[in-house]
Amino acid sequence: MSGRPRTTSFAESCKPVQQPSAFGSMKVSRDKDGSKVTTVVATPGQGPDRPQEVSYTDTKVIGNGSFGVVYQAKLCDSGELVAIKKVLQDKRFKNRELQIMRKLDHCNIVRLRYFFYSSGEKKDEVYLNLVLDYVPETVYRVARHYSRAKQTLPVIYVKLYMYQLFRSLAYIHSFGICHRDIKPQNLLLDPDTAVLKLCDFGSAKQLVRGEPNVSYICSRYYRAPELIFGATDYTSSIDVWSAGCVLAELLLGQPIFPGDSGVDQLVEIIKVLGTPTREQIREMNPNYTEFKFPQIKAHPWTKVFRPRTPPEAIALCSRLLEYTPTARLTPLEACAHSFFDELRDPNVKLPNGRDTPALFNFTTQELSSNPPLATILIPPHARIQAAASPPANATAASDTNAGDRGQTNNAASASASNST
């Protein structure tokens, strides 16, 4: 979690809203096996507001925190597992997480299937329940497994996980949405298919230039230096810094900047990047330009990592963990980095022999920040496949574990027509 209590009341430009209109009763019954079945009136996550009855069973708690509780459940109609995130709804405000999740539709972002409201134990207490894709693992748990075994995560997995993370960031940033809590715990994984899905949009916000934002955001080890400096006019490049911290952690087997406080965090960053120049400090937060820092030289990146770390991985890390926010790569530029060239090889497979997940089904929306990058991001074999088959919706749920055959979308088709 980001270290601050989270309800659905926000100080950052949230507008009052009336009582939820889709508030419905929760009915409990038993199926033929005697299992408890809960039926609610829920609204689909995407599309028009058409509430419908949804029944689920086999409910159990799988997570909790300051945000609320997460349950696992099984949908009765399909037998699919889902995660239900239950958060306290402040009736004075719209729930920003819900508003954002209803906009998103991408193969590397956890999907909002339904949402519904339920009453709490106290009078007038209302909870918002988000019914999400259930994904069994996290990057955090997988990385911890390797670390405890005194092993490093195989580089092919580092490439797959980071590439998909950057795709998800390119997508949300194209809408002006900043996640603000990128960390290994919020990166869900299917261990069989290697599909990664970004989750937990409880801290996410659509950033508007000129509007202030809270600086106490993001979990400590992954906080960009401008946040530590108290900046309130930051950009979505704080997500890129966090992603750089995740990449470094996967390569090292431990967090790269493990500070116990904000000041300690800054010390850890300075140990690696050296003391920021006055100009770099001005770029992060102009109010700090007169602050005196001890003069420390940057540590060579090659000495930060193990000797066998791929040079391309180190080069990518150095382009993400930059003091100056505008000097950091964009997520789309990161996807095009040479570190990920192996993923663009038509013969690449997962270590278990399976095809890689969908990697090249870019939408025009995803490519909007830099359309010319499509020539790098969509390799020739994917362009040929796109030209030979009708384009499909890049964000269809079935894309997530079916490879890229026949699934590259209009952006790929356009690229194919221009370059084949």
From Swiss-Prot:
Gene disruption: observed consequences: Embryonic lethality at 16 dpc due to hepatocyte apoptosis.
Catalytic activity annotation: L-seryl-[tau protein] + ATP = O-phospho-L-seryl-[tau protein] + ADP + H(+); L-threonyl-[tau protein] + ATP = O-phospho-L-threonyl-[tau protein] + ADP + H(+); L-seryl-[protein] + ATP = O-phospho-L-seryl-[protein] + ADP + H(+); L-threonyl-[protein] + ATP = O-phospho-L-threonyl-[protein] + ADP + H(+)
UniProt modification remark: Phosphorylated by AKT1 and ILK1. Upon insulin-mediated signaling, the activated PKB/AKT1 protein kinase phosphorylates and deactivates GSK3B, resulting in the dephosphorylation and activation of GYS1. Activated by phosphorylation at Tyr-216. Phosphorylation of Ser-9 in the hippocampus peaks at CT0, whereas in the liver it peaks at CT12. Inactivated by phosphorylation at Ser-9. Phosphorylated in a circadian manner in the hippocampus.
Region: Disordered, residue numbers: 1-53, 385-420
EC number in record: 2.7.11.26, 2.7.11.1
Keyword Cell membrane: yes
PROSITE patterns: PROTEIN_KINASE_ATP (PS00107), PROTEIN_KINASE_DOM (PS50011), PROTEIN_KINASE_ST (PS00108)
Protein kinase domain mapped to chain residues: 56-340
Function: Constitutively active protein kinase that acts as a negative regulator in the hormonal control of glucose homeostasis, Wnt signaling and regulation of transcription factors and microtubules, by phosphorylating and inactivating glycogen synthase (GYS1 or GYS2), EIF2B, CTNNB1/beta-catenin, APC, AXIN1, DPYSL2/CRMP2, JUN, NFATC1/NFATC, MAPT/TAU and MACF1. Requires primed phosphorylation of the majority of its substrates. In skeletal muscle, contributes to insulin regulation of glycogen synthesis by phosphorylating and inhibiting GYS1 activity and hence glycogen synthesis.
UniProt name for this protein: Glycogen synthase kinase-3 beta
Organism: Mus musculus
